Each structure stands twice: as structure tokens, then as C-alpha cells.
């Protein structure tokens, strides 16, 4: 049994690399299994400890995650590393449980319209699915952590603005269903710092001793500012992807997740120790360039370097 407090210690910021899952949803060419393993091991060498490694979805539709079981084994072999995988239905949950992954993530849409369009089910059915996931977790041998992400929590691609009270109600229902914590997702990058701070603060208060995760996209260039607001509001788990990999099928042209290396720099600059070596982290981008040629990578640090000097391998590779 994995204890939440052991994986996400109180008072410490935990940064999760979601590039191996969320970052690969829309790419035209995805890394080989060996490439993913090098990516993860090199980030681990830089100090990263939390990895969203893939999804338990049909390989015929999502071939980029066909090797998820192998990647789960890879992260499990790294001392102190923590693997997370997405599962959206009972079949996926059972496969995730069989894999031994340490944490299972699932999703509930903030709006009825998006829930029907994206998952072909109502929000009530989505909550019932969360409850069933928790029941299966409780009946399993290793009892992984379960988190529920509220997608479109800060703006919906279909309805536009989202009532924060509706999001808070869904968070409450997910906690009642048995999840270990919730993640607030600005799926299409609609929000600004004020909105992120206010919603995060409300959810931190209602979550009590349970941590709160904030998952942000940089669609309109507000990702880092929003992450800063989330930290100020009490969130202690943040998601990002190396090079800002990712995107959203509901936001054409979106630049993807918050750049992971810039997120590390933000946390360190605000006084939150991450244990991550930024120069080593930036150097891992070379693997992505090799495995996914033509894929655009973003990032202020990779472009400009650290304030006290260049970022090493990344800047040399860019000028070569």
C-alpha cells in the first residue's frame, strides 16, 4: 500500500512530469520504448521523482501507450520514483491494478456538455465511475493512490466560463467517493492567476489534510503565472512536461502543458526546494529532439539559460 504522505510529503512541493502521458497525446511521432526509458532515467538522474507514465487505453487507438506496462516496470525499478497512469473505465482500472502502478489517475469533466461530448456520459455517471475505481482499489492487493482530475475546471471548450461552485461540488463528490486527492485542470488554458488562486484556495480549504494538485496548460502564455498563483494559494503538487510537450484536442494551436523546466525554476525562485538539477533537466531535451524530430519544444530556460550562465548541453546542441 502506497501512502499519500510518503509520496507527496506535507509542506513540500512535488512536481510531476506528465510528458510521457499528457505530452504524447497529440504528437505525430512518439518516442520508442527505449527512448521513453532514457527520458525517464535521465530525468530521474536530474532529481525528478514523479512521472505520469502513460494511459491504460486501447492500443489500437492510442499506440503511443501500447508499452505502458513496460514503462510502469521501468519507473518501479528506480528507487524512490513514483509512477502514475491514467485509467478512464473499469477495464482500464483493472489493467492498471494488474500492472502494479503506484497511482491511478482518472478524470471528471467540470461541465455536463463536455462530459457528454468527451466521455459520452453524464457527470453523475463519471462520479459513479470514480467510486467504482476506488472500490476496485480498496479490494486490490497493493492499493495504489487514486486521484481524480476535474478537467475544464477553469474554463470549458464548449460552454466557456465555468461556475467555480460547480467545480467545488464535483471535488467534494470525488473526495466522498474515496479518492486520495483531486487535481484541478485548466485543460484548455483559459484561466488567469486571479481565477486560479481563488479556486485553488477554496479547494485547498475543503481538502483538509489531503494535498491538491493543479494541472495547467500554457495555451495563452499564462501557465507560469498561474502556477505561481496556485503555489501562493496552497497547492503543493504541480504538473508540467519537458519542453512544454502536449496540447489539447479541444484547443487547436495550444502550446501544451506548462514547461517542466521553467516550472522547476519558478518553484526554486519562490523558495520551494525541488531537489531537481535544472541544467541536467534541460539537457534531457536532447532525447526528445532525437526521438521526435520536428516536434516543437518550448521553454524560457532552454532559450535564455539560467541567470548565472548557460544551461549547458541544451544551448550547445541548439547552436551546433
Functional labels for PLM-detected ranges:
Residues 1-320:
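Catalytic cores and adjacent flexible loops of soluble metabolic enzymes
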Amino acid at each position: 500500500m502506497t501512502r499519500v504522505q510518503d509520496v507527496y510529503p506535507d509542506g513540500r512541493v512535488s512536481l510531476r512530469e506528465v510528458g510521457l502521458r499528457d505530452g504524447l497525446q497529440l504528437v505525430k511521432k512518439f518516442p520508442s520504448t527505449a527512448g521513453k526509458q532514457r527520458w525517464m532515467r535521465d530525468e530521474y538522474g536530474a532529481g525528478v521523482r514523479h512521472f505520469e507514465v502513460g494511459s491504460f487505453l486501447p492500443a489500437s487507438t492510442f499506440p503511443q501507450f501500447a508499452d505502458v506496462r513496460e514503462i510502469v516496470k521501468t519507473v518501479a525499478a528506480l528507487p524512490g520514483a513514483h509512477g502514475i497512469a491514467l485509467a478512464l473505465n473499469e477495464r482500464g482500472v483493472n489493467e492498471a491494478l494488474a500492472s502494479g502502478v503506484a497511482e491511478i489517475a482518472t478524470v471528471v469533466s467540470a461541465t455536463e456538455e463536455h462530459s457528454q461530448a468527451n466521455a459520452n456520459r453524464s457527470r453523475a455517471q463519471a462520479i459513479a465511475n470514480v467510486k467504482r475505481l476506488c472500490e476496485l482499489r480498496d479490494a486490490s492487493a497493493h492499493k495504489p493512490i487514486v486521484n481524480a482530475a476535474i478537467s475544464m475546471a477553469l474554463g470549458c471548450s464548449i460552454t466557456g466560463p465555468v461556475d467555480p461552485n460547480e467545480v467545488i461540488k464535483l471535488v467534494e463528490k470525488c473526495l466522498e467517493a474515496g479518492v486520495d486527492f483531486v487535481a484541478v485542470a485548466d485543460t484548455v488554458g483559459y484561466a488567469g492567476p486571479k481565477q486560479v488562486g481563488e479556486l485553488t484556495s477554496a479547494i485547498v480549504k475543503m481538502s483538509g489534510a489531503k494535498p491538491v494538485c493543479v494541472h495547467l496548460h500554457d495555451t495563452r502564455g499564462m501557465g507560469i503565472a498561474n502556477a505561481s498563483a496556485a503555489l501562493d494559494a496552497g497547492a503543493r503538487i504541480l504538473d508540467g512536461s519537458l519542453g512544454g510537450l502536449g496540447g489539447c484536442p479541444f484547443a487547436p494551436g495550444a502550446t501544451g502543458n506548462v514547461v517542466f523546466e521553467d516550472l522547476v525554476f519558478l518553484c526554486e525562485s519562490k523558495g520551494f526546494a525541488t531537489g531537481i538539477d535544472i541544467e541536467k533537466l534541460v539537457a534531457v531535451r536532447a532525447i526528445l529532439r532525437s526521438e521526435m524530430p520536428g516536434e516543437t519544444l518550448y521553454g524560457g530556460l532552454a532559450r535564455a539559460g539560467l541567470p548565472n550562465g548557460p544551461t549547458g548541453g541544451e544551448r550547445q546542441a541548439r547552436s551546433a
